[in-house]
Regions:
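Substrate-binding cleft of secreted/luminal carbohydrate-active enzymes
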Residues: 312-313, 317-327, 346-404
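Short, acidic/polar
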Residues: 10-24, 139-152, 294-310, 326-330, ...
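Catalytic domains of carbohydrate-active enzymes, especially glycoside hydrolases
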Residues: 16-43, 151-160, 305-317, 369-374
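The substrate-binding groove and active-site-proximal loops of carbohydrate-active enzymes
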Residues: 2-12, 65-84, 128-143, 254-264, ...
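Substrate-binding cleft/loops of secretory-pathway carbohydrate-active enzymes
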Residues: 171, 278-324
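Active-site-adjacent "subsite" loops/lids of carbohydrate-active enzymes
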Residues: 6, 102-154
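Polysaccharide-binding and catalytic clefts of secreted carbohydrate-active enzymes
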Residues: 129-275, 290-292, 298-305
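Glycine-rich, aromatic-flanked loop segments that form ligand/cofactor-binding clefts
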Residues: 31-56, 83-127, 160-170
């Protein structure tokens, strides 16, 4: 199976051994961040630092001044990695080590953008804004995201891209000193708290024949037993989550939300993919980080499998965990694949972040039986030496057919 490792530019810039170390894992490709959200990242082998703090979402290359001149929404530049173009410097080093470089572009996830432009943020049923989550129904947000996708994806030398958060973002977010766990929000509760009631979304609901204010009140009513501790609004698996949403809201109201959000997300994906392809040379591969439950949001956006595979060249799917986790996400895409479709199983290989590098060979083999033809490894820069040793062993087993 073809394998690619996720990498940040700061893992490579300033470390002359990094590119060769990654190539020696046995991967054929790296997925290198070109536009990324704020984070605090470990760099356990870098000669100059151990922690990198990316203070806000930024592009890791020099943005095109002409593209963004005079626009209110535009990408921020980074200042925490030395040099004007850390992406380009890292990409060159990785390519010199024999690795194929693809870009990693985070789109609808940008806390600084929402803080500085509060009108663009998702606004929940209570009127609270989520600055990390730009509302993808808003025309100015869509224009920004589509142009960012084209610019950040098609970097010099890149052979393809992976678009993360190309759709709705909502409540779920690794926020600063988070303290929202007082009421257990299951999947259905997360969905209700992620529904947007900004002006654009309100107009969208009205356009479907619904009363936006009545919908908002219905969401507030549905969540009352959650805050009272009477229900966790869970639902279990993906199908159970949606059944719980319909139970809490009523099927008709749930259908309005689904129709609006699915339409918005699908059209954004289509526009972003088209913009990337227009900016790229032929055979430039466009993948989307995705989840087969359309109601889900976040880094792995919820999609309809048939719809997304008609738009993009493939998907990257969350496959960390046991066999049940993989069985839930891979099979829904298999009937809709073509000969060129990529179904990439994404595995966390950092033990401290919930990964299991020791079982990677077995887990990847299971994913292959379910239809995956590539794997992704999160993350070559964050993993410990011990974790990387386990990855090397696993990739050797997979390449020689010894994985069970």
């Amino acid at each position: 199976m073809r394998a690619s490792a996720f990498v940040y530019p700061w893992d490579v810039v300033g470390d002359p051994d990094a590119a060769r170390r990654i190539a020696d894992l046995g991967v054929q490709q790296v997925t290198l961040a070109s536009a990324y959200h704020s984070t605090r990242a470990l760099t356990p082998r870098h000669p100059d630092h151990r922690i990198v703090t990316a203070r806000h979402a930024a592009v890791l290359y020099p943005p095109d001044a002409g593209r963004w001149q005079g626009r209110e929404l535009r990408p921020y530049r980074q200042s925490w990695v030395p040099g004007d173009d850390p992406y380009g410097e890292a990409a060159a080093a990785l390519a010199d080590a024999g690795l194929e470089v693809h870009t990693w572009v985070v789109l609808a996830h940008n806390s600084r953008l929402g803080e500085e432009h509060p009108s663009i943020a998702v606004r929940n049923a209570y009127g609270d804004r989520y600055p990390w989550a730009p509302c993808v129904a808003r025309p100015e947000v869509r224009a920004y995201l589509v142009d960012l996708a084209a610019e950040a994806a098609v970097r010099p030398g890149a052979k393809g891209t992976e678009l993360e958060s190309c759709g709705w973002y909502g409540l779920a977010h690794l926020h600063a000193h988070d303290k929202i766990g007082g009421a257990p929000l299951g999947g259905a509760g997360q969905y209700l708290m992620s529904l947007c009631f900004c002006d654009s979304c309100g107009a969208g609901y009205e356009g479907l024949g619904a009363d936006a204010e009545e919908l908002r009140r219905a969401v507030v009513r549905a969540l009352r037993p959650v805050w009272a501790g009477e229900t966790a609004a869970g639902g279990g698996d993906r199908a159970g989550e949606w059944a719980e949403v319909e139970k809490l809201l009523g099927a008709d109201r749930a259908a309005v939300f689904a129709a609006w959000r699915d339409r918005v997300a699908s059209s954004l994906r289509a526009e972003a993919v088209a913009a990337v392809r227009a900016a790229a040379e032929t055979d430039f591969r466009v993948l989307l980080h995705a989840d087969p439950a359309p109601h889900r949001s976040g880094a792995n956006v919820g999609v309809d499998p048939a719809d997304v595979l008609a738009q993009a060249d493939g998907v990257v799917l969350p496959c960390t965990g046991g066999e049940a986790a993989r069985s839930a996400v891979l099979p829904p895409f298999v009937p809709h694949r073509s000969e060129r479709t990529v179904l990439a199983a994404n595995f966390t290989v950092v033990t401290g972040m919930g990964g299991s590098p020791a079982t990677l060979a077995r887990d990847a083999a299971h994913a292959a039986r379910l239809g995956a033809d590539e794997i992704r490894l999160y993350h070559a820069g964050l993993a410990s030496d011990q974790d990387l040793a386990a990855v090397r062993t696993a990739l050797t087993e997979l390449s020689t057919g010894r994985a069970g």
